[in-house]
A protein has these predicted regions:
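N-terminal signal-anchor transmembrane alpha helix
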Residues: 1-31
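Structural signature of hydrophobic alpha-helical transmembrane segments
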Residues: 84-98
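Interfacial loop-to-transmembrane junctions
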Residues: 102-126
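Cytosolic, membrane-interface loops and tails of multi-pass inner-membrane proteins
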Residues: 26-57
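Core segments of transmembrane alpha-helices
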Residues: 61-76
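Juxtamembrane boundary at the C-terminal end of a transmembrane helix
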Residues: 81-82, 127-136
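Perimembrane helix-loop junctions in membrane proteins
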Residues: 23-31, 79, 83-86, 111
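Membrane-interfacial loop-to-transmembrane-helix junctions in polytopic alpha-helical membrane proteins
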Residues: 1-8, 50-60, 85-89, 111-112
Length: 136
């Protein structure tokens, strides 16, 4: 049961990250409704550097966010399937998904919207229950 819960929770991360990456490059779902806002983003740079624009940074942040979530899934799915004893025997590997999903849940609540919030909440519940089963 612990293994299945980890796989379910991490698979949700992979699905959310993949959808996010597809939406970033193949749709306009992350574009602002106000076209003038997008144009302004394309014309101005962040104070950090003139080497990019707010728009290019926005696309890059969305892409790197997606890739990070997908990488988490790409590491933990095979680990849970092929070497679950590593997760079971390590406090670090059994609790890291709890910390990661709780962090994303907080971000989703504060900055994002309902779909990622629900996805990360379900993942967190899976990870918490799995960790509890492993350590009791």
């Amino acid at each position: 049961m612990e293994q299945i819960l980890i796989i379910i929770g991490v698979s949700l991360f992979g699905v959310l990250g993949t959808i996010h990456l597809v939406y970033t490059f193949s749709t306009e779902k992350f574009n602002p409704y106000d076209a003038s806002a997008a144009e302004a983003m394309k014309r101005t740079s962040p104070q950090l550097t003139k080497e990019t624009t707010i728009w290019r940074a926005w696309i890059g942040f969305n892409a790197s966010h997606s890739l990070g979530v997908m990488l988490f899934a790409a590491i933990y799915i095979p680990l849970a399937i092929n070497n679950f004893e590593v997760i079971e025997s390590s406090l670090w590997f059994s609790l890291l998904p709890v910390v990661v999903s709780a962090s994303y849940l907080i971000l989703a609540k504060k900055y994002w919207f309902k779909i990622p919030f629900v996805g990360f909440l379900v993942s967190l519940v899976c990870f918490l229950f799995s960790a509890w089963l492993i350590h009791t």
